[in-house]
Regions:
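Double-stranded beta-helix
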Residues: 4, 117-198, 202, 303-321
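Conserved short histidine dyad/triad with adjacent acidic residue
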Residues: 41-48, 59-76, 233, 245-265
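Short histidine-centered beta-strand/loop micro-motifs
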Residues: 48-53, 70-76, 93, 101-102, ...
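A generic "binding-loop/recognition-motif" signal
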Residues: 69, 77-78, 116-117, 126, ...
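Glycine- and acidic-residue-biased ligand/ion/polar-headgroup-sensing regions
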Residues: 77-90, 94-95, 264-278, 282
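Short acidic-glycine-tyrosine-enriched beta hairpin
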Residues: 95-113, 282-299
Length: 321
């Protein structure tokens, strides 16, 4: 019996926010934000509100903030790819945040390498939102720059060695647990340095995709990360990051459809950026809207159709190395 497709549809309006997901959450510029665990727990230090807690080979999260709010400098041990749904966002990187910066807007993609410090901030005049793909079922933990942990401690927030957070203004640190010490200078030097031109190779701008395909009709496919196979085509990636645990592509077109059904033995999700999309899964169908997430049942035959002009939809697939 085929599962009811609505059980695998995660609507943006139903996402459950975590208001204090990280140790920095009481610092100025980090208070007015919501973090979402859409698929899997992600790397939040306050585990709550997972929309779909089923291993997919990757995690999907989201963050929305008020203007001038964002995230402090941090590093990951697995991939972190940002999909901008509403901007603008400024990204900055380096141990002190001064190695480079870039402003990205709706539809832009950036894939940050591991073992580097990066942060971001909403530099618009309204609330902005973006989704993040984190590699693997267990994406590891966040490593914060030393200054973040020191400043957070002054607000009463401490990060423990087991990656849990304690607000010492409201509770005591458990006797059997220890506070995580900030990185020392030698440890900071082990993180990689990237120039602006290096990170530019990790960015795909939405405007460039649109201008290159204005005259095309029907469905168009692109691959951001890893070779992407669809509609009897194999698409080469535009970003040369690999072994991340997932492949990442997109489909766009004006009121067009993928005619042939296909199936996969691994997980696949759809996330519209623009327009409504109808998803056909064997004898069922469902409509998904921008910022919704639909996880297709494994092995089920599926195809999709763009219902609006200028439809654009992300596709993320589990990749077993």
């Amino acid at each position: 019996m085929i599962e009811n497709l609505n059980n695998r549809l995660i609507k943006y309006k139903d996402l459950i926010p975590s208001k204090k997901p990280f140790v920095e959450s009481k610092l100025e510029g980090h208070k007015d934000r919501s973090v979402y665990s859409i698929i899997g727990p992600g790397v939040t230090e306050e585990l709550k509100g997972i929309s779909l807690n089923e291993p997919h080979g990757f995690n999907l999260g989201g963050v929305d903030t008020a203007p001038n709010n964002g995230s402090s400098l941090h590093s990951h041990t697995t991939a972190e790819v940002f999909m901008i749904h509403k901007g603008p966002w400024k990204f900055f990187w380096g141990a002190d945040g001064e190695d480079g910066e870039v402003v990205l807007n709706k539809g832009d993609i950036v894939s940050f390498p591991t073992n580097m410090f990066r942060g971001f901030r909403n530099v618009g005049s309204e609330r902005s939102i973006m989704y993040t793909i984190l590699g693997r079922d267990d994406p590891g933990v966040i490593t914060w720059s030393p200054e973040v942990l020191k400043k957070a401690k002054n607000t009463g927030m401490v990060l423990l060695e087991d990656n849990s957070i304690v607000d010492t203004t409201q509770e005591k640190i458990p006797e059997n647990k220890s506070v995580l010490a900030p990185l020392n200078d030698e440890e900071v030097k082990t993180f990689d340095i990237y120039r602006p031109e290096d990170i530019e190779k990790c960015i795909i701008r939405y405007q460039d995709l649109q201008s290159n395909n204005d005259t095309n009709t029907g469905l168009n496919f692109i691959s951001y990360i890893e070779n992407f196979q669809i509609d009897n085509k194999t698409l080469a990636p535009m970003i040369s990051h690999n072994q991340l645990g997932f492949t990442f592509g997109a489909v766009f077109g004006n009121q067009s459809s993928l005619k042939n059904f296909y199936s996969l033995d691994t997980h696949e999700i759809y996330i519209p950026l623009e327009g409504k999309w109808k998803i056909y899964c064997e004898d069922q169908e469902i409509i998904i809207n921008p910022m919704d997430t639909f996880s297709v049942p494994v092995k089920l035959k599926r195809r999709f159709e763009s219902l609006d002009d200028k439809g654009f939809m992300y596709i993320v697939r589990e990749k077993i190395d």
